């Protein structure tokens, strides 16, 4: 990846985080959360979502919607990843069990906050690909 690509992805990630933050405000009455917690915001800003989608979807990686990842599965919408992370109130020192690894994006976001993430995936090919991504 070129430096220009990395900068473009970084600016797209900043816009994605801002859009997710706006959705928190718009859904406050339904969720009880008017803003992302600082640790979830930092994790979303740091984890490179484009690494967790197939090459043909990378140009769409920072849009706030789910994307196909193969085997009939999708990577969750960034807002849903942020909201579900905030709702479990993760803290440093905790361990989290995630059921349904998918591409590994949610696990990567959680790993920025908690001490240990255990993730289980039913589809062997997705589990293998996610494990490879999460090792790098």
Model-derived regions, located:
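Class I SAM-dependent transferase core
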Residues: 2-97, 113, 128
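Conserved nucleotide-cofactor-binding alpha/beta core module
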Residues: 87-136
């Amino acid at each position: 990846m070129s430096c220009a690509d990395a900068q473009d992805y970084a600016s797209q990630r900043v816009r994605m985080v801002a859009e997710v933050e706006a959705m928190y405000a718009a859904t406050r009455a339904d969720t009880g959360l008017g803003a992302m917690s600082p640790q979830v915001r930092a994790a979303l800003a740091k984890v490179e979502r484009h690494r967790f989608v197939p090459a043909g979807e990378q140009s769409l990686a920072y849009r706030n919607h789910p994307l196909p990842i193969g085997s009939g599965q999708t990577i969750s919408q960034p807002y849903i990843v942020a909201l579900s992370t905030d709702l479990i109130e993760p803290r440093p020192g905790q361990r989290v069990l995630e059921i349904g690894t998918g591409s590994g994006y949610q696990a990567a976001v959680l790993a920025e906050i908690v001490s240990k993430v255990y993730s289980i995936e039913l589809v062997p090919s997705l589990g293998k690909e996610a494990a490879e991504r999460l090792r790098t």
